[in-house]
Amino acid sequence: MRLQSLSSVAIAETRRQIILTIINSLVYLVNFISCPSIHSIPFHISTHLTSCQANISLLKIVGLHCPFHRRGIASLSVCVALHWIAFSCSVMCHFAWSCALPCFVDSFFPSNFFLRTYALFTFSLQLWSGNDLQGNHSYLATPTR
């Protein structure tokens, strides 16, 4: 009975995160198309927030359904690796499109690739340690059994 209730919670949370991902992606796209300058302050603020939230939503979906994570097998190393890959992709998009994608990191380390990479890695570890950006308990940090 408990397993069935955990499964229904995971399904409901997955649906919620998919909806959040779609909304954040659409907001990001509208901002990208409608903003006259990709270097304007409103563009940076909105894209930082929406792209970061979209990444977090996708990673929560991965965490909820990852068999390693659900069984508690190598959850830290496997899931941090997935998180690191996702943020690395965001960094590559940053260089390709010349706009700030992942979070607030670009504002603090605009020109130093190594500092940016280190900051993203520590930020991903912080998310996995138990809290997301709003201070809520992260689904990724606690394996469901």
UniProtKB/Swiss-Prot annotation:
Q: Where in the cell is it found?
A: Membrane
Which example biological process does GO assign this protein?
Answer: meiotic cell cycle
The record's keywords, sorted A to Z, are: Meiosis, Membrane, Transmembrane, Transmembrane helix
Topology relative to the lipid bilayer, per the entry, is: Multi-pass membrane protein
Q: Which GO terms describe its cellular component?
A: membrane
Name the source's superkingdom: Eukaryota
Q: Where are the transmembrane segments?
A: 18-38, 95-115
| Stated role | Has a role in meiosis.
This chain belongs to the protein called Meiotically up-regulated gene 124 protein
